[in-house]
Amino acid sequence: MIELKNISVTFQQKKQEIQAVQDVSLTIDKGDIYGIVGYSGAGKSTLVRVINLLQRPTAGTVIINKENILTFSKKELRQQRKKIGMIFQHFNLMKERTIFSNIDFSLKYSGLSKSERRQKISHLLELVGLSEKRDAYPSQLSGGQKQRVAIARALANDPEILLCDEATSALDPKTTGQILALLKKLNQELNLTIVLITHEMQVVKEICNKVAVMENGCVVESNDIVSIFSQPQQPLTKDFIRTATHIDQALTTILEHPKLADLDKNQELIEFSYVGDQTNEPLIAQLYSQYQVYTNILYGNVEIVQNVPIGHLIVVLSGDEAQRQQALTYLAKQGVRTNVLKTYQQTKQKQNLQVI
């Protein structure tokens, strides 16, 4: 449905060229909730504005429904933009107008009669759960309610695509969850394609089925959400995953604890990652019964991503080196990814440094 081909965006700042987006190619299918995640300055907001040509690319092609919209006339582009709604971190509501009037403003040139507009606005308010607020003013609403109004306004012209630029960044965690649930509902009920810009991997995990990770204007990794969470390839992606699964907090606690992180001879501190049916397998029991390797679980969790369980364990493996190696080989054959976090030799080196 949306194809971005070799998109680059360059800004001229004084005498310096700044490349905000560098040679990015993405394909977003109809019905996707596609997340684009990255830290501030990664280029994600610039990229999403290319989709509706609020930002024209310096180079590349923008294909929507098999048409290159870069070739559209001004009139054709106006019609195209009606099919693309957009919401932002800041709600941009007109404070002197009621909620009803804020949405009605978007229908000003729709060709609908006053009665038809009234009926449509009532339906939109019902869709976003704000029917009782139609005569209220923005100042009387909470942040979450204001974003619901912004969503209703963005849907006024029956768009096929909804662009969400940091739409939950100004909201508390509970309200964020409610807005994400609403977006997921709209995606399912309206077959709405959603492109979600965020710096929070937790947001992506909640509703996206695909994700691209951006850094310094480039997409460093993209895949379906389960593959990204279960088999991240790039260091930045791994960092984002850890923040969304709280593994980084657990690992920091373990490594900084004087007893938990100290290993004896024939011990290793290891992280296991597994996905899908592997979460139901008694793998830890198998390590002892087959290889006489003891497993001390220091931390574990299971995340549900797109209805697929993804598990993580941080453990201390105990056994002679050959047995541990056989156990790790067995786990690899079962599809479990292993990452050696610390060895006895590293513990010993640290102790020697402390003595010195």
From Swiss-Prot:
Presence of the UniProt keyword Protein biosynthesis in the record: no
Source domain of life: Bacteria
EC number: 7.4.2.11
Membrane-related topology note: Peripheral membrane protein
Catalysed conversion reaction: L-methionine(out) + ATP + H2O = L-methionine(in) + ADP + phosphate + H(+); D-methionine(out) + ATP + H2O = D-methionine(in) + ADP + phosphate + H(+)
Compartments it resides in: Cell membrane
Subunit: The complex is composed of two ATP-binding proteins (MetN), two transmembrane proteins (MetI) and a solute-binding protein (MetQ).
Descriptive protein name: Methionine import ATP-binding protein MetN 1
